[in-house]
Every structure is written in structure tokens, then in C-alpha cells.
Amino acid sequence: MGRSRSFIVLISLLLLTSGCLRQAYPTTAPVTSDVELQGATVVSPSEVLSKLSTAKSPRFLGIWDGVLFDYELFDEAVLARDLERIERFYHARGYYEAKVTAARVIRVDEHRVRVELRVVEGAPVITRGDIQRFGLESVSFDVGIAAYTAVTLRPGEPLDEDAYEASKQAMTSALADAGYAFAKVNGRVDVDIAKHEAKVAFFVQPGPLARYGKVDIVGLSEVPENKVRQALQITEGEAYSESNLQDARRALIALGVFNGVKITADRSDPESRQVPISVVVEEAPLRSLKLGGGVRLDAQQTSAHLVGAWEHKNFLGGLRHLSVEARPGVVLFPTRTNNIESPNRLLFEGQLRSQLKQPAFLEGRTTGSLATGLAVFPLLYSESTRDDPLIGFVRPDAKVGLERAFLDHHLYLTPSYNWQAYLPFDYDALSVGRSIDVERDSRLIDVIASFPDLSVRLDLRDNTVQPKDGALISVSWQLANALLSGTVNDMRVRPELRGFYEIAPGWVLAGRATVGFLFPSNYAESTESSNREQQLLDECQIETANPAADPDPALNACQRLAEDEQKLLVRGFFSGGPESNRGYPYRGVGPHRALSFLSRGNVDCTADQYRDSRACLRPIGGLTLWETSIELRFPTPVSESLRAAIFVDASDVTRGVVEFRSNALHLSTGFGVRYLTPIGPIRFDFGFRIPGSQAPGIDSGNSQADGDPPLLFGLIPATLNLALGEAY
């Protein structure tokens, strides 16, 4: 009843305030309330309407016009020109007989009109199959094939002016890539309206082979020119290539010190066979200080943090990029979306990170980097209770690596060496509020991961922040070893594929698939089989009841279990969360069991009656992972900056090496909204776990194998996610 009353009050307030904020209707002209195009079948009506000046007035929340947005005024002269634009739009796509047969202006009321348009598209003019190319005889076979196949105009399809112009440009670029900087491509189109067909021919003048002339760089002030030239890799006298110029521009942008880069080739003197190059840059501020903050509210924790960051992009000269960031925060424990209650403890956490990058390291296109960090954080779960003693970790880490771009900055190779340490401690020392001491368990160990990492990324997306088309393929390979005091030995491999396709203007279908494999050699004994795990658990229970029975730690079952659990916590795979399976909280998908190194207050999780209870079960991590997702992203009528999405996610994590289960999909579906900002979309997702499509243990009501995440607000099997950036 209280929630219903609150909802009614909210709607009433919106209705009242909308009247206060709504602009008065103009008296000079009627307002266009809607524009409708009928008869459009070969193209989307919205695509045609987006080209017109006559447009419907935007509506706040899709309901009220004149609230926060200006009205669109109706003008008969503008509408007349728009009718010509519609016919020209169709002509450019091969529909030469298209006509606007009706344009009705309907008076809605004394202030508003609705515009209804009707178009008859007619039959298209089809491109004949014999598209001719003349003039390629004078170039080499490989160059001729590249120019010949560059034509994007397709025989048997409607004659498209954009494809025709793009074909000429593509042929010119193919020749320019091979050194023919002065190449010219002309075309001729003979249209027979009666037969609805068109003959197309291209005429090529390759011109002489060219070389780069003098290379001038304009606009430098603080940025050292020698580093710019090393990244540019364009030298006077070398063979000309248009693709190399485009790659050079991307390399300069990747330096991160320019707001704009423009590279111009001077082709005004073909007889000289020299092409002077002008590089005009606009330097960005090289030093910056940033202050801010953020909040986190999900099924694992509620927290707030501050952010302070400083960077210098020419530290000590040579374009060295030094950045330092501090992020102190506080967790309101145990408040979270599945446990709405007042906190009884404040847990202080934080991290400090620094990174130094050196462009043109070893050679012009390679960047060297050195990063260090220190983090302090509690070990929290979506099942944690207000009476749980808590442990946390101090995590120092370091990384040294290289990054090199290939294939016009589409392929990135990143080898690095990494060192991470997880040092456990009693988190009562960093808590304010209720004091719950936990005696440090002798089973707690320091876990140190020392490993080389080879990451390869092939990025074919049209945009890295808001992709609409393309794909991203990546793979990471790690080999943990005993160097630098490492305590884990394993091999970890994780490939991933992401794809994007714009099915209609603004409507993007996105997909993601990944697998992960972990091959441990000095841990994970307890995950070999359920029988072996049960044997160790039983032995541990006996040892707990008779502490003097086995004084040798090497033979201690409890110690072996605890070491397995802590190493898997660092190196194992988990699934669930805003960038994973969104129907589950962080680490919500995968094997669960009572962790022998964690205390549960008054509950003895080693006892048979508690071992498989929700009070004791926690995610342990697994050796095999798979995740898939499909998502439809689309615009909303509220604002261009506000977009929406619907998605389906599935994933699983198993204990075994290369072990897959066909009956454990952990299927979730949901919806979300994204508010676009310059630094990426602010994303809110609601993920719902589909009953009967999870894992055998969950679906049957027995959660021993896979855990059973708490209900959202104690009501529904779902999770709320708030994050910055798309899920993928």
C-alpha cells in the first residue's frame, strides 16, 4: 500500500511540474506535433524523415512537448522544399520514378498540426552486370586487381549514387596505396528509364609513381618534434602510400597529446613525382588535475568513493606520460540491493595507482609502460550478514610491458610481466561501528601471482566507445610461476569475441562470447572430483575435532583446502556482474562451498549440519568458464542522449579442467538504459534470472553445487547493475 501511494504521488508531481515547466505555444506559427511518411518500403521511413527540415516536436519522457525542449514550428515553404528532398533522396538510391503523391497538413487543435506524407516509390533502375573498368592495363597485376575489386557498386542492385561515388574513391585509394598518388578515376552512367537499367563505366588515369616530398610539422609548442617524427614514420624520398598516411595519423592521435591531427598531401605537381606532406597538429593540455567521486550500489555492497588524479603527458621531456590516481572510499556494510538494512559498520577501502608510459620506446610505434598499485579492500559476498567477521586484503602489484600496433592500428600486441600479492588481514582494523574481532586463522596465507601475459587484440569496430558495426577479437595467455616469490603455478588462457551490427539507423545488435581455461599445477587438489573434495572435507572435520592428530601441515587436509580456496580466489574464474551475466551479482555463477579459511561468527561451517547451508556457502571459483550474451541497443523518444537495451546473458563456471555442462545455462534476461556522456555511457541494467533455466542445483531447490544468490529486495530473482561504459 505504501509503495502504491508513493507511486501515485510521484506521477502527480510529474504532472504538476510539467505544467509549470511547459513553454507557451508560439503565436507566430503552428507547432508540428507529428510527421508521418506512408508508402516507404525499400527504405526506413525514419531514415527519410531524418533528412527533412520539417520535424515533429520532441517530447519529454515521450509524453509532453514544450517541456525542456523547444517546439518545432510548421512552415509551408520549408515543407515544399522537403517534398523535393524526399524525391531526391529516392533518386539517389536508384528510384527515379519516386513521387510524393500527397502532403496533408491536419489541424490537431488551435496550436498544433500533424503532417502526413505519401510516397510512391516506383520501380528501381538496376545496375547492369557488366560494370566496365578502363585504364588499369598500365599498372601491375596486383595493383590492378586491388583497384578492380575496390568497386562497391553491385550489379543487379538499384543504382546507388553513394555507392557509385564511393567506388570511384575506393579505386583512387587502392591506386594511391600502391604509390600512384596522382591517380584519377572518372565515371559515366547511362540510365535508361524505360528499361529501368543503367550502364556504368569507370575510366582510370594512374599517373606516375610518386614518393614523399618534404614533411613539415606545424603546431608544436611543448611536444618534442623528434618523438612526433618517430611515431609518424613518414620520411622524404620513401614510396608514397595513402594507407601509411592514415596509419601515421592514427599513431599521432594515439600519443594522447593532440586535440586534432590533420595530414595533407600536396598533389599539385605530378611532373615532379614528389608529394610534400603537411602535418598540422593542435596540442592538448599536457598537465591536468581531476577531482571527483562516485557511488556503487549492487548485490554485493553499497559504497562511495572520492577520486583524485594528476597526469603529466611530457614528464621530464620525451613525451613520458605519468599518471597518479588515488581512490579512497567507504563501504556501508552490510547494506546492498538484496539486503536493505541500515549499516552496522563502515569499512574503509582505497587504492593508489601510478603509471609511466614512454612512446617511441625501442622504435617509433612501440610504447613501453611501467605501472604500480596498492589496494586495500574487504572480502565481501552477496550472502554476507551483519554478524560476519570480515577479512580483507592488502594488494600491492606491479606491471611492466610493451604495446605495438599493426595493420593500420587494428591489431595490438601487448606483452607484459605482472606481479600481484594478496596479503590477508582482519578488517576490524579498518572498520568503524560494531567491533567483531576475528582471530587470524593459521590457514590464511599470502598468495603471490607472478606471471608473463601476452595479450593480442584485433579491433575492427567503427567506434571504440559506442560501436555500431565491426568486431573485436582478443586473447590473453598467462603463465604463473615461482619467479619473484610466486606461490601459484598455472597456465591461464581466455579468448573473447565481440560483434556489432546496425540493423537499422540507431538500432544495434551486439553479441559477445568468451571461454576461459585454467590449468593449475600446484593447487586445486580439492576440485579434482567431488569424491576427493568430500574426502578432504571429512578429513578436515576430523582434524578440527582432534587438533593434535596430524601436526604436519603438509599432510593437513584443512590447510590444503584453505590454500586451494585462497589461490582459486586469486586465479580462478568467476561469472556474474555488470560486465558479465547481469542477472547475477559479482561471482554469483559457479562452484560454491563453505570456505575453510572464513569464520561465520557463531556458525561452525565445518559441521555437517551447516556445511551446505546458505550461511556458509561462498563462491570458490572454477577452472573452466564460458559466457555468451546478445543485446539489442536502440534509441528512445525522450532524448538522443538516452538509449535503451534489452539483453539475454548466459554463463557457467565449473570445477574441472576443460569441463562443460549442457544443463547449466544460468540464463538471465532484462533491460537497461544508457545516458551518453563524453567519457562513455552511464549504464543501468536490470537482469532477471529465468526460472528453470539456471543450473540443476538451483532449479531443483538444492543450491549446494552452484549457490543461490539472494533475491533482489528480498522479492525477485534479479540483480540491479549501475556502471560506466557498455557491458561490451
Spans of features found by a protein language model:
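Periplasmic polypeptide-binding modules associated with outer-membrane biogenesis and secretion
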Residues: 2, 19-46, 51-297, 301-309, ...
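Bacterial N-terminal signal peptides
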Residues: 8-18
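Transmembrane beta-barrel domains of outer membrane proteins
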Residues: 120, 205, 280-282, 307-313, ...
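C-terminal outer-membrane beta-barrel translocator/porin domains of Gram-negative envelope proteins
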Residues: 254, 288-301, 313, 420-641, ...
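Outer-membrane beta-barrel channels and translocator barrels
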Residues: 258, 284-286, 315-317, 349, ...
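Transmembrane beta-barrel wall of Gram-negative outer-membrane proteins
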Residues: 342-444
